[in-house]
Amino acid sequence: MAQKFRKQAVKKNRTNLGTGVVHIQSTFNNTIVTITNMSGDTISWASSGSSGFKGARKGTPFAAQTAAEKAALDALSTGIKTVEILVKGQGSGRETAIRSIEGAGLEILSIQDITPVPHNGCRPRKRRRV
């Protein structure tokens, strides 16, 4: 029988990165938090789905809080102390994610909203009727 080779997990080496960038993408169905260094290389990430939530509960503020805490604690272990926050989207987990990043121990330097707004571009989807 052929030998099975297991891929070893890549260990995050602790370097004193100092400053990082937190990207929060908040949609109505999910919240994704990615922490990168200043050049854009991913250090840690978490989403509501990867934090154990399924279905409609992924879009809740509590799920966003859990995902942000998970990513922030992971980034703290690699040596990041201060962050700039870039928020994209209009989901319900925006403010909660920012608060939980601050509560995890990361110092926030700036918060920017980079939600893309069309200058009357594509036609929107059909309106939802309830």
Curated annotation (Swiss-Prot):
GO terms for biological process, alphabetical: translation
InterPro entries in the record: Ribosomal_uS11, Ribosomal_uS11_bac-type, Ribosomal_uS11_CS, Ribosomal_uS11_sf
Signal peptide: none
Protein source organism: Thalassiosira pseudonana
Subunit structure: Part of the 30S ribosomal subunit.
Localization: Plastid, Chloroplast
PROSITE patterns in alphabetical order: RIBOSOMAL_S11
Short name of any one Pfam family annotated for the protein: Ribosomal_S11
Family membership: Belongs to the universal ribosomal protein uS11 family.
GO molecular function: rRNA binding; structural constituent of ribosome
GO cellular component, one term: chloroplast
Protein's recorded name: Small ribosomal subunit protein uS11c
Keyword Ribosomal protein: yes
Keywords (A to Z) from UniProt: Chloroplast, Plastid, Ribonucleoprotein, Ribosomal protein, RNA-binding, rRNA-binding
